A protein has these predicted regions:
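Positively charged n-region of N-terminal signal peptides that target proteins for export
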Residues: 1-7
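Extracytoplasmic thiol/disulfide redox context detector
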Residues: 4, 12-98, 140-163, 181-216
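Thiol/selenol-based redox catalytic cores and closely related redox-interacting motifs
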Residues: 95-187
Length: 216
């Protein structure tokens, strides 16, 4: 059905960065048009936020995806320094336990903490390689959780995107931008530097609970 993106070196990284340098008068590249669609449709998803930075990055991940795990690790610094807010959009389709793990994260009282458990214990479940969180059994997955996960997956499927991780954001030039895979740290730093800053918001815990998307 789907796949993960094995692009640790991201051969397309240079081309992606070149897209950002196109002058405003140039026709919008198809990749950036696709990013615009993702931003327009993100309100139909359920995400939870980690971090308090004014730069907002949406990331679609599967709990059992090793490249999603790499990207999670590489985003620790910007998130923990308060430079970045990541809005995690969870899907569950890669393996037989992905749905149960995705549901366990979404139904947790603190989804950010649940995702951290999944990532910090990644690869340590001998009987179930992948994310470290215990998957929920079928009967424990609430109907609203199934609907939320289906809507999250539909964001990808409706745009003919079938690999994770998938990241997208509003760039400083006002247009959408996206990338796939887990870029090397130096490339990731350049990509994150392109993100526009949102206006300062009232205080509060941005990662307390899942919510319907409200970004773009």
């Amino acid at each position: 059905m789907g796949r993960l993106l094995p692009r640790p070196a991201l051969a397309l990284a240079g081309a992606l960065l070149a897209l950002a340098a196109l002058p405003a008068g140039a026709g919008m590249h198809p990749t950036r048009l696709l990013a615009e669609r993702l931003l327009a449709e993100v309100d139909d998803t359920t995400w939870f936020a980690e971090g308090t930075g004014r730069k907002v990055l949406y990331v679609v991940i599967d709990p059992n995806c090793p490249y999603c795990h790499k990207l999670w690790e590489r985003l620790r610094g910007p998130v923990e320094r308060g430079e970045l807010q990541v809005r995690w959009i969870i899907v569950g389709y890669l393996t037989s336990t992905s749905l149960g793990k995705a549901a366990a994260i979404l139904q947790a009282e603190d989804p950010v903490a649940a995702l951290r458990v999944n990532e910090e214990d990644f690869g340590f479940r001998d009987e179930d390689p992948g994310g470290g969180i215990e998957p929920l059994p079928e009967e424990a997955i609430r109907d609203e959780t199934r609907l939320a996960l289906a809507a999250n997956l539909a964001l990808m499927q409706n745009n003919n995107l079938f690999g994770v991780p998938l990241a997208f954001f509003r760039a400083a030039d006002g247009r959408g931008f996206m990338f796939e895979g887990a870029p090397p740290p130096d490339v990731l730093k350049e990509l994150l530097s392109l993100i526009d800053e949102e206006p300062a918001a009232p205080g509060g815990d941005p990662g307390a609970a899942p919510r319907a998307g409200s970004g773009g």
